């Protein structure tokens, strides 16, 4: 048997996050700047969490109002607190609620930055609107942890697999920008960290310029999750007995078989 832990044996997110955050120190100690902790919440994947978002210190990336139809499915940036201080109760309650579900539901990432909220929000808004080939238009949905993993790359010990990064190193550095560390949970429920210090290249300018090959890689990489989303939405009984990691690999396997029959459209793939 492999020595790697199974998906079920991974430590709870509350435990791993507490250990990791307690180890984080500001990068510019001489300047005395604390690291600010932020939550980037993908409300569309777990709408119940929006009710726990505090009234202050939270902004929708698309600037929608909280009670609007769009605001209820928009990604939200929430300031939780800073290093060296305990979180206030509303922020801690929100973080706990996220940590309780994030290993099974990829709905949030955590960010640490010396920037205050307005500066970080401005950076994320610039980064999410890349230049596309042939004047196409689309947002870079890095608030979805699975998209973030595709953009920056991710290794998974449990499946012994690796997602190669869609972005070039200079583009990855540009996406991180003022973000010192960016955390998400992998498909097998493990905490994964991206650190700005890991990218030595000079950052590319924003907005990012994506090539046709990069766009195609993002689209193809997102197909399994898109199909799972529609299955969960319309026919949840089909996946009741499969945990998220197993469901993802099942979908990827079936896509290989479906494409052998020449099936490519979303409806055809779902029916298959």
Pin down the residues of each PLM region.
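Short, charged beta->alpha transition segments
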Residues: 90-98
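A contiguous, surface-oriented mixed alpha/beta subdomain in the mid-to-C-terminal portion of proteins
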Residues: 1-72, 77-78, 82-85, 92-93, ...
């Amino acid at each position: 048997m492999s020595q790697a832990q199974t998906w079920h044996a991974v430590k709870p997110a509350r435990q791993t996050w507490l250990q990791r955050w307690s180890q984080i120190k500001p990068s510019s100690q001489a300047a005395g700047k604390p690291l600010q902790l932020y939550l980037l919440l993908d409300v569309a994947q777990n709408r119940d969490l929006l009710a726990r978002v505090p009234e202050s210190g939270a902004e929708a990336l698309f600037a929608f109002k909280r009670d609007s139809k769009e605001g209820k499915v928009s990604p939200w940036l929430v300031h939780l607190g800073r290093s060296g201080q305990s979180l206030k109760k509303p922020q801690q309650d929100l973080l706990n609620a996220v940590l309780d579900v994030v290993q099974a539901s990829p709905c949030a990432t955590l960010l640490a930055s010396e920037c205050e909220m307005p500066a970080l929000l401005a950076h994320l808004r610039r980064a999410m609107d890349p230049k596309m080939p042939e004047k196409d238009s689309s947002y870079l949905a890095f608030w979805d942890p699975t998209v973030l993993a595709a953009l920056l790359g991710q290794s998974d010990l449990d499946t012994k697999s690796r997602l190669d990064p869609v972005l070039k190193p200079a583009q990855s550095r540009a996406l991180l920008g003022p973000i010192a560390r960016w955390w998400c949970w992998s498909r097998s429920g493990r905490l994964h960290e991206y650190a700005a210090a890991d990218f030595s290249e000079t950052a590319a300018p924003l907005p990012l310029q994506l090539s046709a090959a990069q766009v195609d890689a993002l689209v193809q990489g997102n197909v399994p999750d898109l199909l799972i989303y529609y299955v969960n939405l319309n026919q949840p009984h089909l996946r009741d007995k499969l945990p998220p990691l197993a469901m993802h690999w099942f979908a990827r396997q079936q896509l290989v078989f479906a494409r052998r029959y020449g099936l490519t459209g979303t409806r055809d793939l779902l029916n298959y």
